[in-house]
């Protein structure tokens, strides 16, 4: 199972709380996103996650939109690293106004199996 547990996610949030934006539903964290790789003119959004039973309710769109507006309001360019093979997240980002730029990385890996 590749899902990160709620407790593991909560621990990560607490360690870097100032960089995270969270959404709570019924006093429970249901969605998170983090600003990272911040420079004088750029800021990345990463760690976008909504717990499974709360998906398809607009939480991820709301949180990414909020962080994007925060970054742009602070006169920086907001950007994301995406997996082009993930149509769900890509649709979300494009619906907010993000566009694909040139590929920055090519990953080559070897399995440990």
List the predicted regions and their residue ranges.
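Short amphipathic alpha-helical segments
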Residues: 40, 44, 58-67
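A conserved beta-strand-loop-helix scaffold within acyl/acetyltransferase catalytic domains
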Residues: 2-49
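Conserved glycine-rich acetyl-CoA-binding loop
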Residues: 47, 51-62, 85-87
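Conserved active-site alpha-helix within GNAT-family acetyltransferase domains
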Residues: 61, 85-102
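Residue-level detector of high-confidence beta-strand sites
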Residues: 32, 101-106
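Conserved acyl-CoA
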Residues: 62-77, 99
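Conserved beta-strand-loop-alpha-helix junction that forms the acyl-donor binding cleft
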Residues: 79-90, 106-113
């Amino acid at each position: 199972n590749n899902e990160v547990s709620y407790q593991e996610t909560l621990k990560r949030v607490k360690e870097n709380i100032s960089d995270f934006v969270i959404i709570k539903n019924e006093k429970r964290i249901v969605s998170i996103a983090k600003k990272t790789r911040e420079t004088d003119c750029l800021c990345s959004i990463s760690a976008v996650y909504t717990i499974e039973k709360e998906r398809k309710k607009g939480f991820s769109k709301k949180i990414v939109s909020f962080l994007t507006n925060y970054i742009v309001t602070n006169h920086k360019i907001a950007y994301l690293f995406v997996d082009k093979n993930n149509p769900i997240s890509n649709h979300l980002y494009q619906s907010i106004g993000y566009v694909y730029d040139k590929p920055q990385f090519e990953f080559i890996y070897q399995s440990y199996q």
